[in-house]
Amino acid sequence: RRTLTIIDTTSEMREIDLDRIGKRELLLGRNAEQCEVVLADPIISKVQGKFLMKKDSVAYEDQDSSNGTFVANMGENRLLSKKDGYVELSDKSVLRIGNIHQPDQMVLLLYRDSEETEKWKRQAFGSQPISIGRDGSNQIVLHSPGVSKVHCTICRQNGKMMLYDRNSVNGVLVNGQPVRGMTALRDKDLIQILDFQMFYTNGYIYYRSATSGISLYAKNINKIVGRGKKKKKILNNVNCEIRPNEFVAIIGGSGAGKTTLMSAISGFDKEFTGAVYCNGVNLIEQFHSLKSIIGFVPQQDIIYENLTLKRMLLYTAKLKMPKDTQRQEMEQRIHAVLKMVDLEEHQNTYIRKLSGGQKKRASIAVELLADPKLFFLDEPTSGLDPGTEKNLMMTLSKLSKEQNKTIVMVTHTTQNLHLCDKIIFMGPGGRLCF
């Protein structure tokens, strides 16, 4: 479902389902007789722009409008004009129309290509500060273990709206840039905490308490190892897109660069050229702010075998979850992840007594504690019998859809690839074949 969320100059919000219009080309503008997407605002040209609805994507072109269109897309911020032609939009791309120096006189459009789990909510500012965090006492509650109890506050100060980061574990981004202590907010600013997006406009915060998933886009990824005559390219101009909540397998022959690619797009290997965008934010540049939404399960299970499963998860929760997390919250999260991986009845079993498939599920449970939305696994089915492998693949597929996880795994086996939404096939020399 491809949608536009629009905030106009009066700070009113509305949502348009682009697919429901049912046309390949959609004009955006003030003229209701010509345009399918009508914005009755004087800042908008009669015909402002055009959306091109492709099978798997949407592109936008400015139609030589009076004010142009500012686009924030894949880490790029620029003013579009007719001569730029079509620009491919990614999930959570932001378009702004108007004078960039007068943001209160701008119209903002947020493009989404994934199904949202809930509608936008609106929080008005009064005389008291607004607090945002995990705890139920906040005015804006974000349901994620990675969000601090009180993550940040917003208040009026000397005629400005100021956002203060309250020493949160995972930080705050405003328009893609990390907040160092505090920052002044401008109208139509985009606030991001982990994978939660919020907008500030004219004394209101628009937000969602739950998120729909993470998109990932790899652009021109190249990696070279060795020196001199031993120099070798192991990733060769790889471009790929992974949509929110997709279950994706990376396959290919030995030495094709499967694990190398996964290490790059997960942010754990930063020594490559090109860029990786996580919900439109440069993953490498903002890795500190985004790392808590990433889970990584290595091929070798890293779990302590002389503990019961529940006790091992409790120790891990103390390491992975914010320091202000209460024991009761940890217990609730452990119960939830054991249910996700079908290990509830084994919570008091010593890990050494678990089967190979159960140990792999235990490793997955470890990473699920912090509720990562982007999940990577290296050869998760290696060494498992066919029946156990199929059950694990079914669990991963279910996690992607029911728990809003974007899951990427490297695998050699092909028996159960029909359970995946997408397959990335790597060939010799680190080339993307399919």
Q: Over which residues does each language-model region extend?
A:
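A short, proline-enriched helix->beta-strand linker immediately N-terminal to the Walker B motif
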Residues: 369-373
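Conserved structural motif at the start of ABC-family nucleotide-binding domains
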Residues: 216, 234-235, 291
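Intrinsically disordered, low-complexity acidic Ser/Thr-rich regulatory segments
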Residues: 1-66, 73, 79-145
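Hydrophobic anchor residue at the start of the ABC signature
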Residues: 364-365, 392
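Q-loop/switch helix immediately C-terminal to the Walker
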Residues: 305-322
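Catalytic Walker B motif of ABC-type/P-loop ATPase nucleotide-binding domains
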Residues: 375-378
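Helix-to-loop junction immediately C-terminal to a conserved catalytic motif
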Residues: 266
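Conserved ABC ATPase "signature" region
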Residues: 314, 329-346
